From Swiss-Prot:
Homology family: Belongs to the isochorismatase family.
GO biological process, one term: protein destabilization
Protein name: Isochorismatase domain-containing protein 2
Superkingdom, natural source: Eukaryota
Pfam families listed in its UniProt record: Isochorismatase (PF00857)
Name of the gene this protein is made from: ISOC2
Subunit and interaction comment: Interacts with CDKN2A.
The entry's keywords: Cytoplasm, Nucleus, Phosphoprotein
Any one GO cellular component localisation term in the record: cytoplasm
Native source organism of the sequence: Homo sapiens (Human)
Keyword Cytoplasm on entry: yes
Subcellular compartments: Cytoplasm; Nucleus
């Protein structure tokens, strides 16, 4: 089978990895739509486990910002602590060990900080980045909107969780489809995205 052209942004389980960025206790009451984005990220994690997509988890200065929130469901994953506003330096060794890697699916916070800088670092490495828009947020909706627009300008793909999940599973005859169907039976919770995409002045037009 011919390889997908990079410009199409196709995602396949065998050449993808899921990044979970800094969804920690101290952010719980400050990030817009925090419960909703964690819920969607948890859904992405469950799908990644079903499809054997590798998962990488970071925590920003956990001594001060606390551990990853339990509802993300990261049991069995070893979080990597960092202070840099990018996941890439902490995950450099993991990335280098995966020559088949083409696509990174990115969830977490904050959009204008660690998500943006992680995206730029990954693009610099020649990887495709799929920002899971319903699993990324910021304290400020303005920062969130501008960061999404900035990442798109730089060459990242903006995708919804369900769109990526269905790309990964690929076919209703997939042996894991029935389990995945249970996860997406209910639409992803509203995380304020519709208002960001509406209006004549939207930066995402």
């Amino acid at each position: 089978m011919a390889a997908a052209r990079p410009s199409l942004g196709r995602v396949l389980p065998g050449s993808s990895v899921l990044f979970l960025c800094d969804m920690q206790e101290k952010f719980r009451h400050n990030i817009a739509y925090f419960p909703q984005i964690v819920s969607v990220a948890a859904r992405m994690l469950k799908v990644a486990r079903l499809l054997e997509v590798p998962v990488m988890l970071t925590e920003q200065y956990p001594q001060g910002l606390g551990p990853t929130v339990p509802e993300l469901g990261t049991e069995g994953l070893r979080p990597l602590a960092k202070t840099c506003f990018s996941m890439v330096p902490a995950l450099q060794q993991e990335l280098d060990s995966r020559p088949q890697l083409r696509s990174v699916l990115l969830c977490g916070i904050e959009a204008q900080a660690c998500i943006l800088n992680t995206t730029l670092d990954l693009l610099d490495r020649g990887l495709q980045v799929h920002v899971v828009v319903d699993a990324c947020s910021s304290r400020s909706q303005v920062d969130r909107l501008v960061a999404l627009a900035r990442m798109r300008q730089s060459g990242a793909f903006l995708s919804t969780s369900e769109g990526l999940i269905l790309q990964l599973v690929g076919d209703a005859v997939h042996p894991q489809f029935k389990e995945i169907q249970k996860l997406i039976k209910e639409p992803a919770p509203d995380s304020g995205l519709l208002g960001l995409f509406q209006g004549q002045n939207s930066l995402l037009h």
